[in-house]
């Protein structure tokens, strides 16, 4: 990414800060720092003002910051980052500076207000998250690539998914393939692989439990490329499955298809969630669908906006969302089907190519 690419983002943030009567912002969330200047390390603070953007880190990241940081003056020091701001006189008395309260602990705020005691501090939670909701061309390209890697890995893993194979073997193979086809940091999140009773646990951690006959199997996983995430879920039945297990699969698939058909720019997230929720409720499984329909993707696996029954968000073009209804019935098993989509003016573009047809494993 070019210097100009990140400077555009910084300029947009400065304009938004000005509307809040703020002279700048202290950014401590590492994902937000990456979004604003490109740094991928694990310790940094970004100070953005109208006059200058300063990137603060320590001696471990001299080479990395020289290579990665765009549109900011790099300051290397071993003392706490807030103290660097004071030491370098980067702010003047009575300036009003924003910070994100979701990413500053109580102790951190006490330290910040003590070190910068003559600065007016204001919590402006969510300002960068809202900027990041709509994806630009480069971001969409990265997400498309992450989804393609996910599809490729699933295609290679599926032939080894058989009765008698352990959950963790499948999860480990997916992780290996993401690194084979992607970059060095290629797992979007720890894969969820649940079979039998474990399939009814939405966030199950893979174990040495083996796939058995007459069961449901859920595989939820995704690759990451250039920092951007993919997230896909497919569900399967094994030989000897019951009529109810097949029925649950069909209900979830239909709920997902109908939800995606309802998506377009300016639709409320709550209304899209209700399409799937109402369909599943009418099929008699209301109490077994107990999570939101989906969430946004980007430099984090879970971002706003979200499809949920309490969401107040409205969809805009180039939002990237997951659509993932599920039914989880103890003693019967669970089904979740998930795709990543791009919101368009008149609909949704489904990125995943992996089949959603009912498949039986033997």
Question: What feature does the model see in each segment?
Answer:
Residues 1-362:
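Active-site neighborhoods and metal-handling regions in enzymes and metal-associated proteins
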């Amino acid at each position: 990414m070019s210097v100009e690419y990140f400077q555009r983002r910084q300029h947009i943030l400065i304009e938004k800060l000005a509307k809040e009567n703020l002279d700048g912002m202290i950014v401590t969330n590492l994902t937000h720092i990456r979004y604003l200047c490109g740094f991928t390390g694990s310790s940094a603070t970004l100070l953005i003002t109208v006059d200058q953007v300063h990137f603060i880190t320590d001696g471990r990241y001299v080479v990395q910051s020289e290579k990665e940081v765009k549109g900011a003056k790099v300051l290397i020091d071993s003392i706490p980052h807030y103290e660097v701001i004071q030491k370098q006189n980067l702010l003047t008395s009575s300036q009003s500076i924003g910070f994100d309260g979701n990413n500053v602990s109580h102790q951190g705020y006490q330290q910040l207000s003590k070190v910068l005691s003559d600065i007016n501090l204001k919590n402006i939670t969510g300002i960068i998250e809202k900027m990041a909701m709509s994806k630009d061309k480069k971001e969409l390209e990265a997400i498309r690539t992450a989804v393609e890697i996910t599809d490729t890995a699933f295609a290679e893993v599926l032939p080894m998914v058989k009765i008698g194979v352990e959950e963790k073997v499948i999860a480990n193979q997916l992780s290996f393939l993401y690194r084979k086809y992607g970059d060095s940091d290629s797992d979007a999140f720890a894969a969820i692989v649940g079979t039998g009773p474990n399939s009814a646990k939405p966030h199950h951690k893979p174990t040495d439990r083996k796939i058995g006959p007459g069961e449901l199997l859920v595989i939820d996983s995704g690759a990451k490329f250039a920092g951007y995430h993919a997230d896909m879920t497919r569900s399967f039945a094994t030989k000897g499955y019951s009529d109810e297990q097949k029925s649950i699969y069909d209900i979830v698939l239909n709920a997902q298809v109908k939800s995606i058909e309802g998506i377009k720019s300016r639709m409320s997230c709550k209304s899209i969630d209700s399409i799937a929720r109402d369909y599943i409720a009418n099929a008699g499984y209301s109490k077994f669908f107990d999570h939101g329909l989906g969430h946004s993707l980007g430099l984090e696996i879970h971002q706003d906006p979200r499809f949920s029954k309490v969401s107040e968000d409205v969809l805009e073009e180039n939002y990237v969302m997951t659509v993932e209804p599920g039914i989880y019935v103890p003693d019967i098993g669970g089904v979740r089907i998930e795709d990543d989509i791009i919101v368009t003016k008149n609909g949704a573009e489904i990125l995943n190519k992996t089949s959603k047809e009912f498949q039986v494993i033997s």
